[in-house]
Amino acid sequence: MELCKLAGVSRSGYYRWIAASNQRAIREASDYQDFLLIKEAYDYRGYAKGSRGICMRLKRMGITMNRKKVQRLMRKYNLCCPIRKANPYRRMAKALRTSTIAPNYVKRQFRSYGPRKVLLTDITYLRLKQKHVYLSVIKDAYTMQILAYQLSESLEIDFVLETIKSLMRNHLYEMNAEVWIHSDQGCHYTSVAFQRLLNDFRLRQSMSRRGNCWDNAPQESFFGHMKDELQPYVNTWDCFQDVKERIDDYITYYNNDRYQTTLGGMSPNEYYHYVVTGKKPSALVG
């Protein structure tokens, strides 16, 4: 009784606290077990995920967990996901340039025409010790799949041309005269060599308006998320081959295992299969 007075609590309140201790212990144990599942989903394939990505991965593990609960347990156990930062690096190296700027035919209608109709392309950089390497990517705006990519130590135009050639080697049967290749107005895409190559392959060209990143927003989004998820590996890269191997692994992961809310919780490759066949992954059926 004296202890209750010193603590400023009633005797009945003290006994209620004692009686509830078992329930608190049970809740703590349950939280920890659920957190272990969250951590397993977070660590899957070695790339960090936010609460949405964790919920979608848990579903593939046969576990349904409320997103608010996932967020609560992430805060409780200090599990943080990376936050994307704006990309300050917008200027690319010199390349042959023409005054031929294609109109913005796509007009942000990224997902209005189905798969293999609007293909987005852009270049970003990745840090390697005291220098940069450069990644050129082609992304299907409808399925979000990465269809072709090339990594280069140089900003010379060759690797951008090779990205288009890789697209045609691997997806030739899907390409036709209705395909748009949409980019910004960077010097690579206005070059004679690039425009001639598109013409040779009978691919149509569309360009964002100058200084308007929203005109190529899905591609910008991909680069932003990719850089966040690759951040833990940047300081482990010693040479160009290290970066290449990680990019190869990441693109495979992204296409096959990075589930997206926009795609109904499917990965890009799963979504393309669903669009073509009408069949969802078994984990999402029922």
Regions found by a protein language model. Name each.
Residues 4, 13-114, 212, 269-277:
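Basic, flexible linker segments flanking DNA-binding modules
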Residues 108-147, 153-155:
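An active-site-proximal beta-strand-loop segment
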Residues 174-189, 209, 266-269:
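Acidic/histidine-rich, metal-coordinating catalytic segments
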